[in-house]
A protein has these predicted regions:
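Bacterial N-terminal signal peptides that target proteins for export
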Residues: 1-12
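N-terminal twin-arginine translocation
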Residues: 4-5, 21-24
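Bacterial N-terminal signal peptides
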Residues: 10-20
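Secreted/extracellular ectodomain signature
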Residues: 25-162
Length: 162
């Protein structure tokens, strides 16, 4: 092969490798990125962004998270603050269909608050019990709750763990 042909072949192989690496990286991107982007798009003009972490199945902590969300909506107004509650581990109990706090969750959702449900936790429950309990249909599934918190904080959200 002549010198120009080798050069063209090298360039072609380099481009194929670069495109393959880009495609592989895109395929490996976490699905929570899509959820995070949807969260950021929900209230693009919000002056404040808050993520509330709930990882405990404690009625007092659940009530506190709900109270914080209500109080911030009242203080800033629903158009001025974006609030996302990320539940994982035992904290997903707040989003069960039979939760005693369901009416409060639904009310907050109606005011623009997002409630994220960690699918890693749901998968663990399914593996251990053989079934998935019913969850509030307003819950937004995310692949990993902690990864969702990280993505949100990297995009301007302030993390609060009441």
């Amino acid at each position: 092969m002549e010198r120009g042909g080798r050069w063209a072949l090298s360039i072609s192989l380099g481009l194929v490798a670069a495109c393959s690496a880009t495609a592989f990286a895109a395929a490996q991107a976490p699905r929570t990125e899509a959820a995070e982007n949807n969260a950021l798009a929900d209230k693009p003009f919000a002056d404040h962004r808050l993520v509330l972490q709930l990882s405990d199945d404690d009625a007092k902590k659940q009530s506190l998270v709900i109270s914080v969300a209500y109080n911030l909506l009242k203080f800033y107004g629903p158009d001025k603050i974006a609030i996302e509650v990320v539940t994982f581990g035992p904290g997903i109990a707040l989003l069960r269909a039979d939760s005693p706090n369901r009416k409060f969750v639904d009310s907050l959702v109606a005011q623009g608050v997002r409630f994220d449900l960690c699918m890693n936790t749901v998968d663990t429950i399914k593996r251990e019990t053989g079934h998935v309990p019913p969850f509030n249909p307003n819950a937004k599934p995310v692949e990993a709750g902690v990864a969702q918190i990280l993505a949100l904080t990297e995009n301007g959200y302030t993390l609060v763990r009441p």
